[in-house]
């Protein structure tokens, strides 16, 4: 492979998020549902025999050793003792700190893509285990299927929620995930429910009230758009989203977003666009 290959690095949403317990070690147990979107960044890969990892558009002021894309490539290269190299570029569309998985998705696309084109032969499960050291959400993107997560996020069950249309908006604020989980008003005893029951119920997010109480930018945007649609938080934010049955309905609401707010329209995907493109088998069939 000498030509440049462009691979999708999709966004994700947490369609619901419930916190069921705080453990003695400080970690929170949760129940959440991840779904991919047909919108995201693009990762370009150009494999070569140099043995070097070159970032084509490194982030200014960030050492390459701290860049998740570089770290993912080096991790796979070292783990498999691969002698090949690659030039890697990224076209960013996803907002930083939006809670839609940009960095984790980029790392996963690099792991999956280079494993494929370097022919290093790791299974998706092996790649997911490797990717966990890069971030808690990386295995979701590596496995490539919409998933119900429990525990501290490590117990995954593939599932197929409805593939709706979404309007996703990014309030002009950065939110500290750590601060949200340390907040004394955060619910920590939501009863555990079975996946089948959760899929039949209306979905909410236990973090949303805390975030809306502390970040007026999120509260004001949700309130402003309430006359058009009910938006809710994904993860700990900052992005919010609303669900629609059709693209036309989504476009009609999107037209009312404030001009200074970044946003996009996307369709839910239970199989990652990356895995669709590479025709990879996802877990479990």
From Swiss-Prot:
<dbReference type="InterPro" id="IPR004424">
    <property type="entry name" value="IspE"/>
</dbReference>
<keyword id="KW-0547">Nucleotide-binding</keyword>
<dbReference type="GO" id="GO:0019288">
    <property type="term" value="P:isopentenyl diphosphate biosynthetic process, methylerythritol 4-phosphate pathway"/>
</dbReference>
<dbReference type="InterPro" id="IPR006204">
    <property type="entry name" value="GHMP_kinase_N_dom"/>
</dbReference>
<feature type="binding site">
    <location>
        <begin position="95"/>
        <end position="105"/>
    </location>
    <ligand>
        <name>ATP</name>
    </ligand>
</feature>
<dbReference type="Pfam" id="PF08544">
    <property type="entry name" value="GHMP_kinases_C"/>
</dbReference>
<dbReference type="InterPro" id="IPR020568">
    <property type="entry name" value="Ribosomal_Su5_D2-typ_SF"/>
</dbReference>
<keyword id="KW-0808">Transferase</keyword>
<feature type="active site">
    <location>
        <position position="137"/>
    </location>
</feature>
<dbReference type="GO" id="GO:0050515">
    <property type="term" value="F:4-(cytidine 5'-diphospho)-2-C-methyl-D-erythritol kinase activity"/>
</dbReference>
<keyword id="KW-0414">Isoprene biosynthesis</keyword>
<dbReference type="InterPro" id="IPR013750">
    <property type="entry name" value="GHMP_kinase_C_dom"/>
</dbReference>
<keyword id="KW-0067">ATP-binding</keyword>
<keyword id="KW-0418">Kinase</keyword>
<dbReference type="InterPro" id="IPR036554">
    <property type="entry name" value="GHMP_kinase_C_sf"/>
</dbReference>
<comment type="function">
    <text>Catalyzes the phosphorylation of the position 2 hydroxy group of 4-diphosphocytidyl-2C-methyl-D-erythritol.</text>
</comment>
<dbReference type="GO" id="GO:0005524">
    <property type="term" value="F:ATP binding"/>
</dbReference>
<comment type="pathway">
    <text>Isoprenoid biosynthesis; isopentenyl diphosphate biosynthesis via DXP pathway; isopentenyl diphosphate from 1-deoxy-D-xylulose 5-phosphate: step 3/6.</text>
</comment>
<feature type="active site">
    <location>
        <position position="12"/>
    </location>
</feature>
<dbReference type="GO" id="GO:0016114">
    <property type="term" value="P:terpenoid biosynthetic process"/>
</dbReference>
<dbReference type="InterPro" id="IPR014721">
    <property type="entry name" value="Ribsml_uS5_D2-typ_fold_subgr"/>
</dbReference>
<protein>
    <recommendedName>
        <fullName>4-diphosphocytidyl-2-C-methyl-D-erythritol kinase</fullName>
        <ecNumber>2.7.1.148</ecNumber>
    </recommendedName>
</protein>
<comment type="similarity">
    <text>Belongs to the GHMP kinase family. IspE subfamily.</text>
</comment>
<dbReference type="Pfam" id="PF00288">
    <property type="entry name" value="GHMP_kinases_N"/>
</dbReference>
